[in-house]
């Protein structure tokens, strides 16, 4: 698979305009990226812009801190799906991961995943690895699998750092099933993206997709 097919072309700035979202969608179609990842308020716009193409629409749930209660995350997910989202990146309750509260974490993931799967959509669970040690990452991997999420994702882009090679290796150490991995946060070059793919990532989240593709052209 070519590099472009791994990229979730991302625009999650709170100041992002509708014109910028439409440009994001045009770029995604031109470079044949896997998806556009936009804020919930822009899902319907993006869905209309990429309708009839292979580009999927991704949005975020409980973003960026994961501190929404489960009922709110479920409502967000339902609205995004109704607006045309095909993929949802949900921030887990990081405080509950750190506290080891398995039932709470698994139940929340399972509830959002069930809504997604009922509509033929996929869910990626953001665990914010910058805030976790290896023990917490192992716990998060177990919860993501138990909740039947499709992906585990490293980062929101709002913590002190994005995903690292060590994070990916840690995911691979503790994931036991078919859960896929998405790397994100600070991926700005072609070499970085390719390295994460070599490590086993199935998706790359980046707002620098065009620059990464143009790097090849130059």
UniProtKB/Swiss-Prot annotation:
Main EC class the enzyme belongs to: lyase
Major subcellular site: cytoplasm
GO MF annotations, alphabetized: deoxyribose-phosphate aldolase activity
GO cellular component terms listed in the entry, alphabetical order: cytoplasm
InterPro entries: Aldolase_TIM, DeoC, DeoC/FbaB/LacD_aldolase, DeoC_typeI
Pathway: Carbohydrate degradation; 2-deoxy-D-ribose 1-phosphate degradation; D-glyceraldehyde 3-phosphate and acetaldehyde from 2-deoxy-alpha-D-ribose 1-phosphate: step 2/2
Transmembrane segments: none
Pfam hit, one: DeoC
Keywords attached to this entry: Cytoplasm, Lyase, Schiff base
Covalent S-S links between cysteines: none
PANTHER family to which the protein is assigned, alphabetical: DEOXYRIBOSE-PHOSPHATE ALDOLASE (PTHR10889:SF1)
Entry's family note: Belongs to the DeoC/FbaB aldolase family. DeoC type 1 subfamily.
Protein name: Deoxyribose-phosphate aldolase
Organism: Treponema pallidum (strain Nichols)
Gene designation per UniProt: deoC
């Amino acid at each position: 698979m070519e590099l472009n097919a791994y990229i979730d072309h991302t625009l999650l700035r709170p100041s992002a305009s509708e014109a910028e979202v439409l440009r994001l969608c045009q770029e995604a179609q031109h470079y044949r990226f896997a998806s556009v990842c936009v804020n919930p308020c822009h899902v319907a716009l993006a869905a209309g812009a990429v309708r009839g193409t292979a580009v999927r629409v991704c949005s975020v749930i409980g973003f960026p801190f994961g501190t929404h209660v489960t009922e709110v995350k479920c409502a967000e997910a339902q609205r995004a799906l109704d607006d045309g989202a095909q993929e949802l990146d949900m921030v887990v309750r990081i405080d509950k991961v750190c506290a080891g509260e398995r039932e709470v974490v698994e139940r929340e993931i399972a509830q959002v995943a069930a809504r997604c799967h009922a509509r033929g959509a996929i869910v990626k669970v953001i665990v914010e690895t910058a805030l976790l040690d290896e023990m917490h990452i192992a716990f998060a991997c177990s919860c993501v699998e138990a909740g039947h999420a499709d992906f585990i994702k490293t980062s929101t882009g709002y913590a002190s750092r994005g995903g690292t090679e060590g994070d990916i290796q840690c995911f691979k150490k503790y994931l036991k099933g078919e859960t896929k991995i998405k790397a994100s946060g600070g991926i700005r070059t072609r070499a970085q993206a390719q390295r994460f793919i070599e490590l086993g990532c199935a998706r790359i989240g980046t707002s620098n997709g065009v620059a990464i593709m143009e790097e090849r052209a130059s």
